[in-house]
A protein has these predicted regions:
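Membrane-interface motif at the C-terminal end of an N-terminal transmembrane signal
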Residues: 18-34
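Hydrophobic membrane-insertion alpha-helices, especially the h-region
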Residues: 8-22
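Surface-exposed patches in mature extracellular/periplasmic domains of secreted proteins
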Residues: 84-87, 139-143, 176-183
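Post-HEXXH active-site segment of zinc metalloproteases
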Residues: 117, 121, 133-163
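Long, well-structured alpha-helical subdomains associated
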Residues: 157, 161, 166-185
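Short active-site segment of divalent metal-dependent hydrolases/proteases
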Residues: 124-132
Length: 185
């Protein structure tokens, strides 16, 4: 019996560290990430807007006001979304949003010539993915439940992309939801 205890003794300390660490993580409501953007607790979630309510069409669009791209970028900055110039991760794309588990991610914008309205829609599209990420409690990029078509889902490969493409011109509504979103502490 003593031989068995001695043979397992070196494993006791690492096992206890894992056990205590697992217990601490299970009792905390958020995962520490070192920044202001953390997994959203249930209490915080109650302060967030209802992201599932679809755009009504009453607010400005990128076609009507292409300068909305600047307001999108300001709101993203306020919330902690990084926006960088560079090569998007997906081939043949002008922009991508890289969601990070537990915190808001990074939008990468390809630097190329485009009309102001197209740039606005491109940025709005990526911020719809940010809204999907917020709706997924920063754990996943979940569908908002906004109306899409089966053809759109098939064409763009996912319901999330179909939502983003269908509503990317509705920058005023995207800004409205971002402004209602509190900065996570």
């Amino acid at each position: 019996r003593q031989i068995m205890i001695r043979s397992f003794w070196p494993l006791l300390i690492p096992f206890s560290v894992v056990l205590i660490g697992s217990w601490r993580l299970s009792t905390e409501s958020t995962i520490p990430t070192g920044g202001p953007q953390q997994v959203i607790s249930r209490r915080e979630k109650q302060r967030f807007p209802d992201y599932t309510f679809p755009p009504s069409g009453n607010l400005a669009t990128c076609q009507q006001d292409p300068s909305l791209d600047d307001a999108l970028l300001r709101e993203g900055s306020r919330l902690g979304v990084r926006v960088i110039a560079g090569q998007p991760e997906l081939a043949k794309k002008d922009a991508t949003y890289r969601a990070e588990h537990g915190r808001l991610g990074t939008i990468t914008l390809k630097q190329r010539s485009m009309s102001p309205a197209v740039r606005c829609m491109l940025i709005s599209h990526e911020f719809i993915h940010v809204l999907q990420h917020l709706h997924g409690d920063l754990k996943g990029v979940d569908s908002l439940g906004w109306q899409t078509t089966p053809e759109g889902v098939q064409r763009f490969g996912s319901i999330q992309e179909a939502e983003a493409y269908r509503y990317q011109n509705r920058a005023g509504y995207v800004i409205h939801l971002l402004r209602q979103t509190p900065v996570s502490q």
